[in-house]
């Protein structure tokens, strides 16, 4: 079932320096909660400056949904320590509140209780809040409070030059973009390994169902928790953060121009369903527009091609200008066993898997096959640890046992690990392979199995509160390592100044400005 990458691995072993200079970044979302686990109703902590313009700490959907962002980094340890510093400083500056350590929220009875993220009075800031108003009215606020970790990854120019020859200009844009689309297609075909190993949302609080019927065969504990005994990541299921209305958009990942055209089409395509919401009611704007996507970021995807945008530039226009610069992996649940929601083992595994995805052959993928890959993902998401579980290839009928496919994949990853260790020194990547491959013979070692044992004992709420309290105490006590207190103070002041400058620079009323941007 795994493509034959022996030739590509032999090539890599002859060109190990092609992997020197991998760049990555991390983003981690977490809800601010009170000591009893309920959602914090306070505004964004003052010490964190402006959520609109802060370089490292912002908010996602809700005012209480923090998002931490590391700069691009070539050093894993440095990146994780930087992320930890962001958590340490925040933990000391959020009063008695804690950071919720799980992807799935609990103790939120009503979506109406959730305040949308606020970004001030600039047109850009108001636009961001209006976008969130649209998300709330389309999908419900509760779904938007699900948290995850995003891992951004780029291969060094040396890799592309070793693979494609001496490339530059338009040629480089085309070939590098084609290479990243290969990564994306392989990710859709084999990325289910991520929720298998690291999924950590096998259960949900009853409030999350909000009385809606579900066809999933949930088991229920006395404290009202619903769980599937072999589930890995309900966050990635239809109960979690997905968008069914997008499933027939026909966006494909074979070609840069085709992908961008599909994305731009979705932004222009009217939606009957969202038209029913209306655009305005009693003088209050309800969404940016009633198209299938209000803006490009609304496209739900487990992985995205990206390029850093210039001021006023849309993500797709940035891709057209310069091609794909990096990949954003979006399938990671919050790691409840780490105070910062992600750990070194996961980052090293993702490095290995992304390199493998860049090496393995990846035939073009029709929108039909893309839909078929969802079958494997859903199996792993809902019953990944079930004994005897099998997976298919694309839309074919042949089935293969998941543990065997996983072990075959890791046989390849081990060779990638040897190459990465040879240029970085030590055996850190090989050690990660040895630790994780054991999860295929013993699913009890996976994150989902480990966290479910705790949740069955103490419920999601009890588990979340215990971890949140422990991490709060730990992070508040730890000294900063990379950043200093004065760095945070300077960035707070600079971010507030940047927001004020944006507000002062606006010349048009929001309604006029919006007509040009909606």
Curated annotation (Swiss-Prot):
Disulfide bonds: none annotated. Pathway: Sulfur metabolism; glutathione biosynthesis; glutathione from L-cysteine and L-glutamate: step 1/2. The keyword ATP-binding applies. Its EC number is 6.3.2.2. It catalyses: L-cysteine + L-glutamate + ATP = gamma-L-glutamyl-L-cysteine + ADP + phosphate + H(+). InterPro entries: Gln_synth/guanido_kin_cat_dom, Glu_cys_ligase, Glut_cys_ligase. GO terms for biological process: glutathione biosynthetic process. GO terms for cellular component: cytosol. Belongs to the glutamate--cysteine ligase type 1 family. Type 1 subfamily. HAMAP family: Glu_cys_ligase. One of its GO terms (molecular function) is glutamate-cysteine ligase activity. It comes from Escherichia coli O127:H6 (strain E2348/69 / EPEC). Keywords: ATP-binding, Glutathione biosynthesis, Ligase, Nucleotide-binding. This is Glutamate--cysteine ligase.
């Amino acid at each position: 079932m795994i493509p034959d990458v022996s030739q590509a691995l032999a090539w890599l072993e002859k060109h190990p320096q092609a992997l020197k200079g991998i760049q990555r970044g991390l983003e981690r979302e977490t809800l601010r909660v009170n000591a009893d686990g309920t959602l914090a109703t306070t505004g964004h902590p003052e010490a964190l400056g402006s959520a609109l313009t802060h370089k490292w700490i912002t908010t996602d959907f809700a005012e209480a949904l923090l998002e931490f962002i590391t700069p691009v980094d070539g050093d894993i340890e440095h990146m994780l320590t930087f992320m930890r510093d962001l958590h340490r400083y925040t933990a000391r500056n959020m009063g008695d509140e804690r950071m919720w350590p799980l992807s799935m929220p609990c103790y939120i009875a009503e979506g109406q209780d959730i305040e949308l993220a606020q970004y001030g009075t600039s047109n850009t800031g108001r636009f961001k809040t209006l976008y969130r108003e649209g998300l709330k009215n389309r999908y419900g606020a509760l779904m938007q409070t699900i948290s995850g970790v995003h891992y951004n990854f780029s291969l060094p120019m040396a890799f592309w030059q070793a693979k494609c020859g001496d490339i530059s200009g338009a040629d480089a844009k085309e070939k590098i973009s084609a290479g990243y689309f290969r990564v994306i297609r392989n990710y859709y075909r084999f990325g289910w390994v991520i929720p298998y190993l690291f999924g950590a949302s096998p259960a949900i609080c009853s409030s999350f169902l909000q009385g809606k019927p579900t066809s999933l065969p949930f088991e229920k504990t006395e404290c009202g928790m619903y769980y599937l005994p072999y589930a890995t990541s309900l966050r990635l299921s239809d109960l979690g953060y997905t968008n069914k209305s997008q499933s027939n958009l026909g966006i494909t990942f074979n070609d840069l121009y085709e992908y961008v055209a599909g994305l731009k089409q979705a932004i222009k395509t009217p939606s009957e369903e969202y038209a029913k919401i209306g655009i305005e009611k009693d003088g209050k704007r309800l969404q940016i527009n009633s198209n299938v996507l209000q803006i490009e970021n609304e496209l739900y995807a487990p992985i995205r091609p990206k390029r850093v945008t210039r001021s006023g530039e849309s993500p797709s226009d940035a891709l057209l200008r310069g091609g794909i610069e990096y990949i954003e992996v979006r399938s990671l649940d919050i790691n409840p066993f780490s105070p910062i929601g992600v750990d070194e083992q996961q980052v090293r595994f993702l490095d290995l898997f992304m390199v493998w995805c860049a090496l393995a052959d990846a035939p073009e993928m029709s929108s039909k096959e893309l839909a078929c890959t969802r079958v494997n993902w859903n199996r792993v998401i809902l019953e990944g640890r079930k004994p005897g579980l099998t997976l298919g290839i694309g839309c074919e009928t042949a089935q293969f046992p998941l543990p065997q496919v996983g072990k075959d994949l890791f046989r390849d990853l081990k060779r990638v690990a040897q190459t990465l260790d040879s240029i970085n020194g030590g055996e850190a990547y090989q050690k990660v392979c040895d630790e994780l491959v054991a999860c295929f013979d013993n699913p009890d070692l996976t994150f989902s199995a480990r966290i479910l044992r705790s949740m069955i004992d103490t419920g999601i709420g009890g588990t979340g509160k215990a971890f949140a309290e422990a991490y709060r105490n730990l992070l508040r006590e730890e000294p900063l390592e990379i950043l200093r207190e004065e760095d945070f103070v300077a960035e707070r002041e600079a971010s507030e100044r940047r927001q004020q400058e944006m507000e002062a620079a606006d010349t048009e009323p929001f309604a006029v400005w919006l007509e040009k941007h909606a």
